[in-house]
Amino acid sequence: MTELGSLFLIVFALYIVQCVCWVNPDSVVFALGLRDRGKKKSRGLTLSGLDTAAFLANPLPPLSPLLVTHWPAFQLNPDSVLISGPNGEATSITWETLVVTRSGSRLLFNGTSVFKGDETQVLGYCQLLQQLRQATRPQRERAIEKWLREGLDSKASARRLQVFQRRSLWIRIVSNLQFFFLFFLLPFAIGIYPRMLRPAIILVVATSVILAIEFWSVHRKLYKKTADTRFTATFTIALSPLAAIRTCDTLCRNLVAGYHPVAVAAAICTDAAFEAIAGEQLRYAKFTSASDWYQKKLVGLIEQVIRQRGLEPRRLLTPSSQMSGCILYCPRCLTQYVTNREECSDCGHKALVAFTSSGTGTSFSP
């Protein structure tokens, strides 16, 4: 292999690393490509020791970013906050004894990490929780209900995505051109037509600067409270052609981070994809040990979004069919079993349900 070929492979390998999206393992990741728009990405490579998962964005033109949404596992109610302990047990913390702190991308309750995500999202939750601590019980109840309604507002998430699509048009065009300049024009100039090398380098650098300027403008519109993050990202894009190619990734990744996955799915998914995601999220909310108050409010709002898409929520709570020989199923993940058992081997849910209508799976016993 020639030196030019080796250099090309090294640069392309670095570019592939740039295409990796690092998220919390509990995040839901959507693709925004022309062919797979709204498709939920299958589970990425999970690094359990680092509490991180890796998802690969489409590296080749037409470039498309990934959309990440991460709903917090902590559950708020007017009297307390419910979190999961190290062994999955529920722990309740009263508002009077709750101490909320943050460390970078982590949110902590009384020193225990309860959420890891986008720094802007963590800051927003920290401010919300501080306000709730100082509120009276009626005020707290109204504020939590408002927060849940906003998180399940599919129209608001759709509007935010539309703003991104409209404002990022030039970024999407120029970043695809930058891919061509860096991986086709520049190697051609180096290996075949050296007289083009200086103009090619100038073109790559100028394109990175243009993308950085446009990124600053769009980011300021979409993320008004993240000046430090905006400066760092703009500086990186201006100096690194590889980062410049993935400018849309930086803009889009946390665009709807504060919205529930069902609200985002309702805004971008096909009917079939939405049904799968909505059913998964509805079952998780309904059959996960939780504060009764929080569970009732969250499930009610999820069901409302499902009905707005013309689906009946109850139909998403049972398997579409009963597999041959199966007598039980898990109401949370719909895994079916041929023998009696006490808990689901896939998700750990303990209250398995017996089929009561042979071959249909449409009826269940609570």
Where are these regions (language model features)?
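Composition-driven recognition of long, C-terminal low-complexity regions enriched in serine/threonine
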Residues: L67, R195, P199-L211, H219, ...
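Loop-to-transmembrane boundary segments
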Residues: S64, S154-L182
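Membrane-interface amphipathic/juxtamembrane segments adjacent to transmembrane helices
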Residues: V23-D79, G88
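Hydrophobic alpha-helical transmembrane segments
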Residues: M1-F12, I173-F179, F184-I210
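Intrinsically disordered, low-complexity segments enriched in charged and polar residues
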Residues: G33-K41, P72, L76, I83, ...
